[in-house]
């Protein structure tokens, strides 16, 4: 019988309506949302994370106690190797075909750095003499090292491949079932886009995201209306719900205004230009258009991540 992991990856790809092939086209991601600069592997973030994941400081000494030590090497395995490693190291059922029906697909499996390896894991490690060029991606729960496409995933063409995104989520799904799910106080989460998730918090704390939410709030309701802003995994970065006076009275007294409202009011107080009627302010309208354009690719990615997360939840 097909295991849960095979169902998970098959469901993900089915919903995305994309065949799992190495030639699968990706969609462009704004470089602003990727810490590593396009075609620049000497970026300070890249080199720093490379040293940290390798257990070295700038001076080359051992850095095993560093807070980034939880980063693990990830290798790309064939479906048969992944099945063996997953059943032994991640608690999967022995009949799981992680790679799905095509058989030639691969999945990411973590290999422990110092823990004693089982015989199966030793065999898997022996088949992978050298890791591909690692890719350091900033996710909702921090920065983690992934070995995909020799660095092409983020660095070479600045695209994010749907199939590889599915692989990453499955990797984290398997990781969630292993003893290494929590290490050195660091926890991983599949809750990417729901209210209160770390991904949502990261998105809301970005200045551009806050500005976007503030502009939408002001455009939709004006200065005096209370709004509730939230970043959703859909076609918008900020979903603004305008509350009437009657609805506001019905809410508990401890309801607080969102950060976007506070920022909106601050902008209104600090800028006479922004305080003008918004529909008559060409500068404001142009700024809003520019920001919406900047978020276009990011919103498409967020929508796909939301679908992936839903599928994983259904089979968990």
From Swiss-Prot:
Composition bias, Low complexity: 84-96, 239-255
UniProt xrefs under InterPro entries: DUF3713
Pfam families, A to Z: DUF3713
Region (Disordered): 82-105, 238-257
Signal peptide residue numbers: none
Family listed: Belongs to the MG307/MG309/MG338 family.
Name of protein: Uncharacterized protein MPN_485
Classification lineage: Bacteria, Bacillati, Mycoplasmatota, Mycoplasmoidales, Mycoplasmoidaceae
């Amino acid at each position: 019988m097909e295991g849960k992991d095979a169902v998970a990856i098959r469901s993900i790809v089915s919903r995305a309506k994309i065949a799992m092939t190495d030639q699968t086209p990706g969609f462009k991601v704004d470089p602003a949302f990727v810490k590593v600069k396009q075609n620049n592997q000497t970026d300070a973030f890249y080199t720093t994370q490379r040293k940290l994941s390798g257990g070295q400081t700038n001076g080359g000494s051992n850095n095993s106690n560093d807070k980034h030590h939880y980063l693990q090497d990830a290798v790309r395995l064939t479906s048969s190797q992944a099945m063996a490693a997953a059943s032994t190291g991640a608690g999967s059922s022995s009949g799981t075909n992680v790679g799905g029906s095509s058989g030639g697909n691969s999945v990411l499996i973590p290999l422990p750095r110092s823990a004693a390896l089982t015989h199966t894991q030793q065999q898997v490690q022996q088949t992978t003499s050298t890791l591909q060029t690692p890719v350091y991606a900033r996710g909702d729960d921090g920065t983690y090292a992934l070995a995909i496409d020799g660095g092409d995933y983020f660095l070479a063409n600045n695209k994010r491949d749907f199939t590889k995104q599915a692989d990453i989520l499955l990797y984290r799904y398997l990781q969630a079932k292993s003893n290494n799910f929590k290490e050195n106080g660091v926890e991983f989460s599949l809750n990417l886009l729901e209210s209160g998730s770390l991904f949502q918090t990261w998105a809301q704390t970005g200045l551009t995201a806050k500005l976007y939410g503030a502009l939408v709030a002001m455009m939709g309701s004006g200065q005096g209306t209370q709004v509730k802003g939230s970043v959703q995994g859909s076609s918008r970065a900020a979903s603004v719900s305008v509350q009437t006076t009657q609805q506001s009275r019905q809410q508990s007294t401890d309801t607080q205004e969102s950060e976007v409202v506070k920022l909106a009011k601050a902008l209104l107080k600090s800028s006479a230009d922004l305080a003008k009627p918004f529909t008559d302010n060409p500068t404001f309208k142009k700024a809003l258009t520019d920001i919406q354009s900047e978020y276009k690719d990011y919103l498409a990615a967020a929508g796909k991540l939301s679908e992936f997360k839903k599928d994983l939840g259904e089979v968990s």
